[in-house]
Structures are given as C-alpha cells and as structure tokens.
Amino acid sequence: MFLINVLTVTLPILLAVAFLTLVERKALGYMQLRKGPNVVGPYGLLQPIADAIKLFTKEPVYPQTSSKFLFTIAPILALTLALTVWAPLPMPYPLINLNLSLLFILAMSSLMVYSILWSGWASNSKYALMGALRAVAQTISYEVSMTTIILSMVLMNGSFTLTAFATTQEHLWLIFPMWPLMMMWFTSTLAETNRAPFDLTEGESELVSGFNVEYSAGPFALFFMAEYANIIMMNALTVILFMGTSCNPQMPEISTINFVVKTMILTICFLWVRASYPRFRYDQLMYLLWKNFLPLTLALCMWHISILISLACIPPQA
C-alpha cells in the first residue's frame, strides 16, 4: 500500500517536470516573439515525450579518465533526493507526516550539494570541477539565509510541522505581514535551484555548461529532471509557508486545486525572471547574500522574537 502511495506522489511529479520543460520553452518563445516548440503533436504538446525517448535511447558516453561509479551514481542521487523532499509536503495531506518536516527539507536540500560535487569531481574535467565548486559555494551560502527566514516563520507558526502553517494562515496569509522575508526567500530559492539570474554554474562562455559538461543522454536527463523537480518543490514550499493552503476536510480536492494554481503561478514567475534578467557576476551574487540578505534576515528574526516577548503572545501551538 505504501508503494502505491509513493507512486501516486512521484509519477505526477515526473509528469509535471516533463511538461514544465515545455511550458518554459513556450514561455521563453513568446517572450522573445517566437513560437517555441510546435512540431511534435498538436501545438508541440508531445515535445517532452519526444525529448525523453531521444535522451533515454541514446548511449551515455563516459569520459575515459572519469570515475565511472561516481559519474553514474551522482545523477541518480540528485533525482532520488529531489523526489524524497516531496514526502512531507502537505498537498493537502503529506505522504509522511513528520513533526520536523521543515528540518527534513533543509537537510535533504543540503545533501543535494553532494550530487553536484561528485558529478564535477568524477568527470575529471577542470570546467566541470569549477562549475561544481561554484554550485556548492552558492547553494551552501543561500541556505544560510533560507534557514534564518524559516526560523522567523517558525516563530510565527509555533511549530516545524508544515501542516500547522495552514492553521496559522486561516485568517491572514503570512506574505502580507512578512513581505520582506517573502522577497528574500523567493530570491534565495532562485539561487538555491541554480536558476537565472543565478545560474553561474552553467556559465556557457567561461565554464562550458558547468558541472554537467561531460554528461549526455540518460544521466544528463536525470540531472535535468532533478533541477525541475526542485523548482516545483521550492515553489510548493513557498506557497505552504507564505500563501496559506487552508484545507477543508469535507472537500480536500478544492484545497489541492488551490495549492496547485498558486504553485503554477510562482513557477511561471521563475520562468519570467529567467526571460527578463541577465546573469549576475559571481562577486555580486555573494555580496547580495553576505552583505544584504544575511544582516536583514537576522535583524527581522530578532524583531519577530522581540514582538512575541513584548506583546506577551504565543503563536498557535500545533
């Protein structure tokens, strides 16, 4: 029974990932005044299936001097972790109801660094290694601000449990009183998922596509799927934390539709940012976090602690 539950969560995610690639190509196409994919199937709707068949039927090429085991296991680890993070997300009911679901998500997203690092090191290419080191530095740096923001959210929520956020936000979404944190959180999720304008790991001109330069066919597709699964997951988490997914026990499907629509809107914002902004310079990326985001998030965290103490109020207890 548990296996069926797992499949009913993972298969729709993989399907959503496939069609998100099509949505991205279509959105970028229309923003650049062109059509995007429109040959395979009606309006190009079968393009993801054609891409999947092409990628998984090609022979993967292994560099002669690479570490075969790590080279193969890194993309598998990336996709496994990307799908595991979905387990505690309430949609409106989670696959596994953890008491410390926010900590679990942070731990899993930290582990994703290893798949990037292994892939860069195992390729035995200086470009791949430099791209991997950039990705690791960027991911670890932005996790600092994300953790501080989550701490502020937990102070308002009174619990690390994600299902408790729906109760907290029954009357008012947390995006309104905590909009500076929401802005910084959204920017941090862009950096955490290595998306434009923070896609420094894939610098085509200086790093020849970064840590996955040696990957092709199936293993490359696994990295690609992991990246897009992380994008949808981060947006789903943003909706849960800031945009209140209140669950009606009589009609849970209504809250699921509500949740999905909000997640789609945020995901399209991710694509819109990619179409609009140029890539950051590496020093600007680090300056933004360590000089701007970190002091501001720490100050807001202290502010939220002092509000609770000074007003002698406690958040809703789960």
Curated annotation (Swiss-Prot):
Annotated InterPro entries: NADH_UbQ_OxRdtase_su1/FPO, NADH_UbQ_OxRdtase_su1_CS
Major enzyme class: translocase
Record's catalysed reaction(s): a ubiquinone + NADH + 5 H(+)(in) = a ubiquinol + NAD(+) + 4 H(+)(out)
One GO CC term, this protein: mitochondrial inner membrane
Entry's Gene Ontology BP terms: aerobic respiration
Segments crossing the lipid bilayer: 2-22, 69-89, 102-122, 146-166, 171-191, 222-242, 253-273, 294-314
Pfam families associated with the record: NADHdh
Major localisation: mitochondrion
Keyword terms of this UniProt record: Electron transport, Extinct organism protein, Membrane, Mitochondrion, Mitochondrion inner membrane, NAD, Respiratory chain, Translocase, Transmembrane, Transmembrane helix, Transport, Ubiquinone
Organism domain of life: Eukaryota
Compartment annotation: Mitochondrion inner membrane
Entry EC no(s): 7.1.1.2
GO molecular function: NADH dehydrogenase (ubiquinone) activity
Bilayer topology annotation: Multi-pass membrane protein
HAMAP family named in the record: NDH1_NuoH
Family label: Belongs to the complex I subunit 1 family.
Job of this protein: Core subunit of the mitochondrial membrane respiratory chain NADH dehydrogenase (Complex I) that is believed to belong to the minimal assembly required for catalysis. Complex I functions in the transfer of electrons from NADH to the respiratory chain. The immediate electron acceptor for the enzyme is believed to be ubiquinone.
PANTHER family in the record: NADH DEHYDROGENASE SUBUNIT 1 (PTHR11432), NADH-UBIQUINONE OXIDOREDUCTASE CHAIN 1 (PTHR11432:SF3)
The protein, known as: NADH-ubiquinone oxidoreductase chain 1
